[in-house]
């Protein structure tokens, strides 16, 4: 946690956590050696400090799990320092896994892939994060982050289309290669 967030948490604790059932704060992500301070990456406000008697975790454990509380939530100053990816390959693999899980979730809810979702939604995700929210101010890091996030939307839509057309999303298991025996 940043020094500012540490001080805000201590102040809330010293007040007995009396003003809210939970506290959210900005998550500042390190993206391959640079903290992203613009675009869709920041401020990524998350609820992480809460009274367990008044809340808990909801959602699927693998994706989009979130804290939820009964009562008011306050935003604390400062940043939660976040190191989400060790490498670009890890991010791409995680993005693909999340895209598949979300496509399966949306398919189960009856959502459908459309050409506009395939073409326009990724473009909008990129332009919103990179231009409108200032991701370009993070340089190459911001460009790559915006591109990978847009590609997630594209992957999810393609996987949703595959599911609605009864096509496999993953490759079937391969038979062992016996040529080397």
Question: Predicted segments — roles?
Answer:
Residues 2-166, 174, 181:
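Catalytic-site signature of metal-activated, phosphate-bearing donor transferases
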